[in-house]
């Protein structure tokens, strides 16, 4: 059965926007944005797309304004929205690693532990999570909402510490701050409205989206290798091969040669290709992968 009314897909606007649109493209969904328009085109008649603030997507999905969308685990915890968490999708603005919400203080401050901040002012956008973090630790602090430029609050004397999100810590250090604790590890999550999830047709579509997004993410860290190998060198070449599964080995028309194909981790290729060449492989081709399911 097909979906009669297109499902509404929430795409995070802002720091995750470009990475999410690229991921959707690799998964098979091309997004075409229009200037000053929050309703981009998508090449799927069963979907309509909406650009929304990542902080608002959980609420929109809970309320049925959106059927499915991508948001941060941090904002899901912050809002406490009642939604179905379909899967974790570990990617962020610049990498395929989780991001961290960290507690940071001035580099020259005397504070070295969260306990040292008792009675102090903490600035953050992640208000609820930060309050729970200190409450769980039994530390009384004054948590204040930050409307932006959070890293500057300590420098300007507006706060004694901040809780801010970071991928690498570079921006934190650039503002003369020092991380003293990790508050939360976060990543992107695919979430769905509960009514949409209970509908068989819509659930099938959500599961399709999840499958292809996961496949595209998995492919990011993998590459394919093809090569021709003389029969006399086949065992030596196969001994060099790590693989996602067993390599594909096929005889060629010239029965003194084999074609070998594998999928390997991108990080091993620079060392692997020279070893394969030394073992007797020829015509080695490396190619990118769009999805690995």
From Swiss-Prot:
Pathway entry: Amino-acid biosynthesis; L-histidine biosynthesis; L-histidine from 5-phospho-alpha-D-ribose 1-diphosphate: step 1/9
Catalytic activity field: 1-(5-phospho-beta-D-ribosyl)-ATP + diphosphate = 5-phospho-alpha-D-ribose 1-diphosphate + ATP
Example of a GO MF term: ATP binding
Enzyme nomenclature, EC number: 2.4.2.17
Entry keywords, A to Z: Amino-acid biosynthesis, ATP-binding, Cytoplasm, Glycosyltransferase, Histidine biosynthesis, Magnesium, Metal-binding, Nucleotide-binding, Transferase
InterPro entries given in the database record: ATP-PRT_HisG_long, ATP_PRibTrfase_cat, ATP_PRibTrfase_CS, ATP_PRibTrfase_HisG, HisG_C, N-reg_PII-like_a/b, N-reg_PII/ATP_PRibTrfase_C
Cofactor(s) demanded: Mg(2+)
Entry keyword annotation includes Metal-binding: yes
Record GO biological process: L-histidine biosynthetic process
Localization terms from the record: Cytoplasm
SUPFAM superfamilies per record: GlnB-like (SSF54913), Periplasmic binding protein-like II (SSF53850)
PANTHER family for this protein: ATP PHOSPHORIBOSYLTRANSFERASE, ATP PHOSPHORIBOSYLTRANSFERASE ATP-PRTASE
Function: Catalyzes the condensation of ATP and 5-phosphoribose 1-diphosphate to form N'-(5'-phosphoribosyl)-ATP (PR-ATP). Has a crucial role in the pathway because the rate of histidine biosynthesis seems to be controlled primarily by regulation of HisG enzymatic activity.
Similarity remark: Belongs to the ATP phosphoribosyltransferase family. Long subfamily.
HAMAP family reported in the protein's UniProt record: HisG_Long
Protein name: ATP phosphoribosyltransferase
Organism: Nitratidesulfovibrio vulgaris (strain ATCC 29579 / DSM 644 / CCUG 34227 / NCIMB 8303 / VKM B-1760 / Hildenborough)
Native organism taxonomy: Bacteria, Pseudomonadati, Thermodesulfobacteriota, Desulfovibrionia, Desulfovibrionales
């Amino acid at each position: 059965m097909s979906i009669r009314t297109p499902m509404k897909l929430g795409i995070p606007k802002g720091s995750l926007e470009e990475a999410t649109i690229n991921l959707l493209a690799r998964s098979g969904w091309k997004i075409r944005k229009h200037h000053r328009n929050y309703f981009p085109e998508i090449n799927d008649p069963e979907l309509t797309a909406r650009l929304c603030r990542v902080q608002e997507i959980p609420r929109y999905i809970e309320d049925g304004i959106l059927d499915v969308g991508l948001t941060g685990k941090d904002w899901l915890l912050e809002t406490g929205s009642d939604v179905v968490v379909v899967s974790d999708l570990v990617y962020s603005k610049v990498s395929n690693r989780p991001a961290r919400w960290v507690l940071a203080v001035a580099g020259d401050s005397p504070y070295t532990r969260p306990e040292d901040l008792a009675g102090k002012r903490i600035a953050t956008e992640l208000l609820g999570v930060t309050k729970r973090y200190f409450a769980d630790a039994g530390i009384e602090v004054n948590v204040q909402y930050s409307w932006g430029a959070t890293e500057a609050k300590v420098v300007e004397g507006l706060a004694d510490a901040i809780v801010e999100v970071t991928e690498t810590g570079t921006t934190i250090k650039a503002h003369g701050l020092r991380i003293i604790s990790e508050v939360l590890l976060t990543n992107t999550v695919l979430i769905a409205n509960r009514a949409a999830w209970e509908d068989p047709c819509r659930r099938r579509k959500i599961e399709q989206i999840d499958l292809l997004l996961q496949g595209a993410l998995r492919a990011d860290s993998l590459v394919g290798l093809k090569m021709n190998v003389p029969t006399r060198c086949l065992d030596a070449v196969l001994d060099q091969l790590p693989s996602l599964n067993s390599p594909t080995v096929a005889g060629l028309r010239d029965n003194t040669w084999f074609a070998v194909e594998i999928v390997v981790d991108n990080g091993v290729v620079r060392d692997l290709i020279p070893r394969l060449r030394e073992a007797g492989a020829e015509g080695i081709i490396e190619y990118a992968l769009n999805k690995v399911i």
